[in-house]
Amino acid sequence: MTFFLRLFAGLLFVLPLAAPAAVQPVASVEGITEYRLPNGLQVLLAPDDSKPTTTVNLTYRVGSRHENYGETGMAHLLEHLLFKGTPRHPTVWAEFNKRGLRANGSTWLDRTNYFASFSANEANLAWYLDWLADSMTKSFIARRDLDSEMTVVRNEMEMGENDPGRMLFEKTLSAMYLWHNYGKSTIGARTDVEGVDIGRLQAFYRLHYQPDNATLIVSGKFDATRTLALIVQQFGKIPRPKRALPRLYTLEPTQDGERAVTLRRIGGTPQLMAAYHGVPGAHPDQAAAELLTLVMGDTPA
C-alpha cells in the first residue's frame, strides 16, 4: 500500500507536465512553434539548447493608443503597478533578486510587455510563469501602491522633460499625428497621471489584461513539452473573457503638406529630426524600410 501511495503521488506530480492533446500547434516557422489555448492566449515557443539562459516575454496588446480622453498614461501606470504583486506573490522584486532573474517591463504605443531572463532552470521558469499568470487577473492595482509609485513615475517624466532628444521626438510625433493617439506621449499628461481615478484604472486593467489579448513567448534553453504543459497548467485555468474589446476607428487624415516643429532649449547640441509616414510593421516592405533608416540615420563607422 505504501508503494502504491508513493507511486500515485508521483503520478499526480508528473501527469500535469504532459502537454494536453487538446493544445495542438497552430503553425511552425524556423524553429518557432505557435499554440493557442482555449482561452485565447497565443503561445510562441522557440527552444535553443545552444543558449545557457531562458527568456520569457508576455506581451499585452494594449498601449498608449488605447487610452481615452483623461486616461493618458494609464497603460504605463499599470506596468508599474503589476510589480506590486498579487495575493500569492506579494513581494515580486524580492523574488526576482533571490532567484537571479533579470526582469522588467516596458510600455509603448501598441503594447505593454513583461520579460525576464535567467540561467536555464525549470524551477525559476515555473515560478515566473506562475507570477505572470497570477498577475494577469489578480494584481492588487491598489490606491496605496499608486500613491507610492507616483514618485517613480514623476521622476521618469522629469527625466524625459530634461532630455532634448526625447522631447524633440515627442514634438515630432505630435506634428505627424494630429488626431490619432500615436501623437501623444506614452508616459501621459502630468494632470491625467496625477489625477487618475483608481476605479477607472482598475477597469482599464480588467478590460485589457486578459488571455485573448496577450502573447506569451519562451525562448532559449528549455524543454518545450514540459514548458507547454506548465503554461497550460498555469494559464489555462483563466477563463476566456466574455467582453469584447472596443473597436478603435480613429484614422489619421492624409497629411496635406510638410510640417515642421522647432524646439528651443538653452544650451546643448543642435539636433535635427526628419520623420516620414511609412509602412506598418506587418507589411512586406517593413524590413527594407527599417534597413533604410539605419543606412541613412546611423552614425558612420
Q: Could you tell me what each predicted segment is?
A:
Residues R6-A18:
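Bacterial N-terminal signal peptides
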Residues A94-N97, F140-E158, D223, K242-D256:
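Acidic/histidine-enriched alpha-helical segments
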Residues L178, Y182, T186, T215-P280:
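An aromatic/glycine/proline-enriched structural segment found at the starts
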Residues G85, S117-M150, D298-P300:
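M16/insulysin-pitrilysin zinc metalloprotease superfamily fold
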Residues V23-Y60:
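Mature N-terminal segment immediately following signal peptide/propeptide cleavage
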